[in-house]
Amino acid sequence: MPSDYRPRLVADQSLPYLAGLLDAVTDVTYLPSQEITRERLIEEKAEGLLIRSVTRCNQSLLEGTMVRSIATATAGFDHIDRDYCSSHGILWHNSPGCNARSVAHWVMGVLAERALRLKRPLAQETLAIIGVGHVGGNVQQMAEALGVK
């Protein structure tokens, strides 16, 4: 590749904090999700996509494009046709745990509201967490910090 090569990306303009972040190393076209179409990907010569779950990455979007990498700013990936991507050499990446702290904060808010309503301090409660993955691990840390058993 030439030394002045810059990858070309198409990004969903609704991705928070992304605008300008990659401009030093790549050429990014920011589009509303509904404008991320096959025709636009071809026109922009996009090699990569930065998307949310509203963009369905399947044959009808990707066929005939230069896209070789897809990154979704979501934990889920059911909007990406993994079989199509695999058979066409397109790498894809999701963002597991990307909203785990926010969900854990919400859970703790619900627990705090319950404690206020019942007039019982959280430190007197015992919490059972089913699964200590991204969200459960964050809930455990926050609950322990507040004295919950």
Q: Regions from the language model: what does each represent?
A:
Residues 7-8, 91, 126:
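Charged active-site motifs of nucleotide-sugar-dependent glycosyltransferases
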